Amino acid sequence: GFEISLGLTGVLALWLGIMKIGEKGGVIQAFARLTAPVFSKLFPGIPKDHPATGSIFMCISANLLGLDNAATPMGLKAMKELQELNTQKDSASDPMIMFLCINASGLTLIPVSIMTYRAQMGAANPADVFLPLMLATFSSTLVAILAVCFKQRINILQRNLLLFFGGMIAFIGGLALLFGMMSQQSVSLYSTLFANILLFSIICGFIISGIRKKINVYDTFIEGAKEGFQTAVTIIPYLIAVLVAIAVFRASGAMDFLIGGIRMGVSAAGLDTQFVEGLPTMLMKPLSGSGARGMMLDAMNTYGADSFIGRLCSIVQGSSDTTFYVVALYFGSVG
């Protein structure tokens, strides 16, 4: 837990420093105004033009590009800003729950990390899981939003929300059609290139906004980086607790026992048990990203990156998030 938190320290310091520049440069507020028509309906508890809206947008955008390292500090910053609005500090507010569910649903348009792993493991077409990943994460995110809206009694028939959902469906469908017409090599090349260019543009844009506002960019970055370091220290106990529980689950043999039972049940029903070999990745993913990643790589190494199991584990790894880890991390950061 301490080693993971230590590894996050540099990333948190970098991105919270960049976010602080963007906040004082007016970029975060601009994002808040841009997303207000939709976010004001999904997050009715957040005041108009509040910085939390911009931070939520930045976190979701980073997740869309598959940039996990960038999304984490942005998400932690959003949670801190939501906690400031929370009237019951020891309980999660409705906006917190909505944000956490959207974040944990794993919406990804460009799975850069998964395609990189598949390329390293010798896949003939590393991007061949692109469309299944996009459709799976879109479905999970849509269900998450609708479920929370139902629970929080948010009217989904509002004009802005209907336009938002319709726009999402049209965009995903158009993107799927576009990439379906391209070769796998082109999909991998252009999606990775787009993600990297956009990431670099965001950093440059934030810095330029700070210069235009005539703020001290260096001091502002250091101020945000200090917040990143403090956040990394704060989450250590929560990470250790969840990682100990995961270690006990694995070391006790409970996971092997569970998988063995499922294999027997599926076999007794006369069904194909091939998918069972992907269950270790499926069961580990909600608990530990690094553990699931290791099992995915082991599956690709054992069965081949282009095998059914290799593709299945890649899709599972890329289309879901480490739910319990995210809960511990995000709620731990706000106490």
Regions found by a protein language model. Give the residues of each.
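Interfacial loop-to-helix junctions that mark the boundaries of transmembrane helices
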Residues: 1-3, 126-132, 156-162, 185-198, ...
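Membrane-embedded alpha-helical segments and adjacent helix-loop junctions characteristic
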Residues: 1-84, 213-302
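Hydrophobic mid-bilayer segments of alpha-helices in multi-pass membrane transport proteins
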Residues: 9-14, 163-172, 193-209, 236-244
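Alpha-helical transmembrane segments of integral membrane proteins, especially early/N-terminal helices
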Residues: 21-32, 94-97, 159-168, 199-202, ...
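Transmembrane helix-loop junctions in multi-pass membrane proteins
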Residues: 23-28, 109-125, 150-152, 176-190, ...
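Short hydrophobic/aromatic segments of transmembrane alpha-helices and their interfaces
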Residues: 53, 90-93, 200-201, 275-276, ...
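Membrane-core helix-loop-helix motifs of multi-pass transport proteins
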Residues: 82-172, 306-317, 323-335
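A cytosolic-side transmembrane-helix exit/cap motif
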Residues: 148-150, 179-187, 240-243, 275-280
